[in-house]
Amino acid sequence: MEYSAAPVDLDVVRRYRLDRLRREMRKRDVAGLLLLDPINTRYATDATNMQVWCTHYETRCVLVMLEGPVVLFDYANHPHLVEGLPTVDEYRVMSTFYYFAAGPDVEEDARRFGDEISDLMRRHGGGNRRIAVDRLSHLGIDGLRANQLEVGDALPITEHARAIKSPEEVALMRASLAVCEAGCRAMQEALQPGITENALWAKLHETNIALGGEWIETRLLSSGPRTNPWFRECSMRKIEAGDLVCFDTDLIGPYGYCSDISRSWLTSGKPTDEQRRLYATAYAQIRHNMEILKPGMSFREVAEKSWPIPDEFLAHRYSVMIHGVGLADEYPSIKYRPDFDARGYDGILEPGMTLCVESFTGAAGGREGVKLEEEVLITETGVEVLSKYPFETQLL
């Protein structure tokens, strides 16, 4: 973030993240790692260029060689965007092959792209033709395979690399959370009967951008009868006195780190007994599920020891009990006990993992629901709660 003082040496973070990727590449005997997802290119290099726009098109990518350079293929020719970055060894302009840019020449341009990647693999791969790719259209994959490259999936590499944060990364996540929570405060101060859901949500956006944040991934704020079931996006509905207002920040703050917390508030007046029951239930769930976490636990053990969801709330339970968070929501995804055998996978909690502990509590056919979520760090001895925004004592 230019014209501001970072809380840590950003080059230390950049080198750590690149080293994490190469460690995972080495485990899987991969010579090259081709990244197009803007979150992964950010993790590898910290070079940014129209992050959200670049999610639409294959217009920018990074090739990380295990025993060679990191080459950034950028949108157009803007080498000033990587000046001073220790993680970019070579800067090139990407040979794009999506129809908007290439028109009828898409196949020819895709072959040119494949030739360029193949040449770098030949020069720096030591005879290893294994390349892992996070996401690429069939035209791009065909261009790689036409050059006898063995294409594999990069996501096991990137997700496991991103899962363990350095102390410096955690410091940046705290900075992002501070901005997120300032935005929550601005929303809560603006909450009064008559404000629309969209106008309230705008307070979070405004604060995030003003304080150096980047964007918000979702529009998950709803009020009153729109809170249950969960996942309705914010609207022009005017919030009424006595409504519960629930939101999930999904905020990409300063330095690109995601702050993902959820809160539920009462709009003026006194809560009903049902509102207090819903809130207390959601609060009990996330408190229990945070307190059981410790390094060395398997994901299955977490699921088995998790808070048992009452039958009346099972149908509308959140899609995941716990998930990782870093530059975005990420590995791991730990399912609830009833879902684990059918949809879950196992793994181990490790120090340095940053996780979000989720709850949505709303009965099928009920008028309202409560969404709560906390962000935590797995330490050497247990868990530290990173998010500090207060809960609503009047609802407990």
Question: Where on the chain are the PLM-derived regions?
Answer:
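Active-site neighborhoods and metal-handling regions in enzymes and metal-associated proteins
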Residues: M1-L396
